[in-house]
């Protein structure tokens, strides 16, 4: 059995240059989400070495580095906490999130699509930023949510998007502006029941646009889908690699949603530029155990 080469590539010089303003944010985020203390990482497996050029980095040096590059290196297999003990990764949290005290609205059967073929859908997908004033139908909203991460094999709990370990850390919050038969407001998608939970009624256009740095597409959309993650669902099992897997899954869910919108003749636009704290506050999330990752605006496209 051949022995693996454990030498790791050296981060670029640019990756180790100061990035003012991001030090505190990235350090706290990676420490909380990654579940380990940056700067105190060392090999867990015999023969493994820290990435060249990073072994001597301490907590005081983090502000002088691209923490994304360091996290990528340190989350490779074989690199974990020093001090002789692994961090406490915690226990597995509940697999689903519900709002038991709010109104629950069953969604229509999502089957029976009259949509483009998969080949046509992939070829036609574009980022669409302008929408008509036409309402989105409840049937289409049901299909979008089911395509994003609805149950596809209920007996085993499998969903439409792949998930590391089938742990499903991603939550979906539709901010509904104009859907036939639905009150405007903040909703939560209960995938197990294929239903919506009305978290708070009201017009969220101003709030989501402010959080989204003034992007007009967020105010025009019939629905803005916000994807969040409950990190512990993945962290307890996959440890320092959990954050990688969570972000990958957000991409899977987002692409499902975009392709479903395109196949239904709708327009969709993905948005990654937003103020995290403002968006988390808008949704009522703490930004630590659960945090917003992604916004996808959907509406009836202009011709």
Question: What are the roles of these predicted feature ranges?
Answer:
Residues 1-20:
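N-terminal secretory signal peptides
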Residues 2-5, 27-220:
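N-terminal amphipathic, basic helical "cap/leader" segment at the start of enzyme domains
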Residues 18-28:
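N-terminal Sec-pathway targeting helices
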Residues 125, 144, 172, 221-227, ...:
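Small-aliphatic-rich amphipathic alpha-helix that forms the alpha element of a beta-alpha
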Residues 160-165, 275-284:
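Beta-rich nucleic-acid/ligand-interaction surfaces
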Residues 186-188, 224-226, 295-297:
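Conserved hydrophobic/aromatic beta-strand scaffold that supports enzyme active sites
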Residues 285-303:
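A glycine-rich helix N-cap at a beta->alpha junction
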């Amino acid at each position: 059995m051949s022995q693996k080469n454990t030498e790791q590539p050296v981060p670029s010089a640019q990756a180790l240059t100061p990035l003012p303003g991001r030090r505190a944010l990235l350090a706290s985020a990676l420490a909380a989400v990654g579940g380990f203390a940056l700067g105190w990482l060392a090999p867990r497996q015999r023969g493994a070495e820290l990435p060249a050029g990073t072994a001597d980095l301490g907590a005081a040096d983090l502000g002088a580095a691209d923490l994304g590059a360091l996290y990528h290196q340190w989350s490779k297999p074989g690199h974990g906490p020093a001090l002789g003990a692994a961090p406490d990764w915690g226990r597995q949290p509940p697999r689903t999130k519900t709002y038991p005290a709010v109104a629950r609205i069953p969604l229509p059967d999502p089957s029976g699509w009259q949509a483009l073929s998969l080949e046509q859908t992939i070829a036609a997908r574009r980022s669409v930023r302008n929408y008509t004033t036409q309402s989105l139908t409840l049937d289409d909203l049901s299909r979008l949510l089911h395509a994003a991460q609805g149950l596809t094999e209920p007996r085993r709990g499998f969903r439409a998007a792949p998930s590391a370990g089938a742990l499903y850390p991603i939550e979906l919050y539709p901010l509904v502006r104009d859907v036939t038969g639905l009150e405007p407001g903040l909703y939560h998608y209960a995938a197990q029941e294929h239903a919506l939970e009305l978290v708070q009624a009201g017009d969220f256009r101003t709030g989501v646009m402010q959080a989204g740095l003034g992007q007009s597409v967020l105010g025009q959309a019939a629905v803005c889908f916000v994807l969040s993650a409950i990190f512990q669902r993945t962290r307890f099992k996959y440890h320092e690699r959990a954050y990688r897997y969570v972000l990958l899954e957000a991409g899977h869910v987002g692409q499902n949603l975009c392709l479903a919108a395109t196949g239904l003749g709708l327009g969709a636009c993905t948005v990654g530029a937003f103020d995290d704290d403002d968006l988390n506050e808008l949704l009522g999330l703490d930004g630590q155990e659960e945090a917003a990752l992604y916004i996808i605006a959907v509406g009836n496209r202009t011709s």
